[in-house]
Amino acid sequence: MNKSTIRELTFKLLYSLEVQKSFENEDIDLYFEDIELDSEKVKEEIKSEVNEIINNNDELLKQISNNLKSDWKIERISKVNIALLKLAMYEMLNKKLPYKVVINEVVELAKKYGEDTSSSFINGILATVVKENNLQA
């Protein structure tokens, strides 16, 4: 299973947890009941990343809020966009993955799962995060 597929599955789990407003291990385990994965290792990789995002939730939400236009509130952002932004910010800031790859793939996920404006909205926020954090390619 390639990294893009793992990223998409990670996003889907994050989105599911956002909708449920529950971040318990039981809910994470429930997600995997209906999904066939290549290996237990892939499952553990996804679970680990989701748990790290949950552990960094407050900081990630703060980063999102700090990068919104002044007249926007975080409550206005769709659950799809929140999940995608958390995933991208975690991968760029915490895992130090190449931001160009992360942004490209998350924008593609936004086109697939988000609203018409999701991809440009996410691209704009993440471009600001890259600039503010002096991320290198």
Model features per residue range: what roles?
Residues 1-119, 123-137:
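N-terminal interaction/assembly modules
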